[in-house]
Amino acid sequence: AMSCGCNYFDTAYVYHNGLSEKAVADALKKYPRDSYLLADKMPMWMLEKPEQLEEIFQEQLNRCQCGYFDFYLMHALEKGVWERSKSLKVYEFLAAKKAEGKIRYLGFSFHDTPEVLQEIVDQKKWDFAQIQLNFLDWVIYRSREQYEILTQADIPVIVMEPLRGGSLATLTPKTCEMLTAADPD
């Protein structure tokens, strides 16, 4: 990937049964640390007590063998997880890691309604957000509204699921006709 110009790598504590971070480290160890951008995520739904924050974060740094994360996300925020994160002071913990230089950009990935997103955006200062954005979810999951909330707040957007896990890569003939009718060019 690096030789083809791809330099942004996204992993998470739980991906591939906890093996993804180590696999990313193995793949990137031959490259200078400043030649790629690494994103990782705090598994919000797993958190039960504040002590877990340091344990998990340090384990991620060790697994990734990276020293710092370029992008770090509160993973899969939705209303319930967001409320619990406030009592655990997750944002404050991660903001401190950012101040220490262990995180360059602090953000979140999101899976809920625009109303919940607005609440999250209004309550903290974010460097970026990651939302599910594709032509199907634009209306169905109100991704357009989410995108507008973030852009109005000057929060950069990272897109996840642009092809919805590959399901949008092959279109049905009827879908092709509809898209062509909407924009023949």
Task: Locate each region found by the language model.
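N-terminal binding-site loop/beta-alpha segment at the start of enzyme catalytic domains
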Residues: 1-36, 67, 99
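Beta/alpha (TIM)-barrel catalytic core signal, keyed to glycine-rich beta->alpha loops juxtaposed to Asp/Glu
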Residues: 77-185
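Conserved, mostly hydrophobic/aromatic
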Residues: 1, 9, 24, 38, ...
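A structural motif
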Residues: 6, 66-69, 103, 126
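A short, structured active-site edge motif that brings together acidic residues
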Residues: 34-46, 72-77
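Acidic-and-aromatic substrate-binding clefts and catalytic sites of carbohydrate-active enzymes
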Residues: 12-21, 45-51, 80-83, 114, ...
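Short, acidic/polar
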Residues: 1, 49-65, 111-121
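Active-site groove signature of glycoside hydrolases
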Residues: 61-82
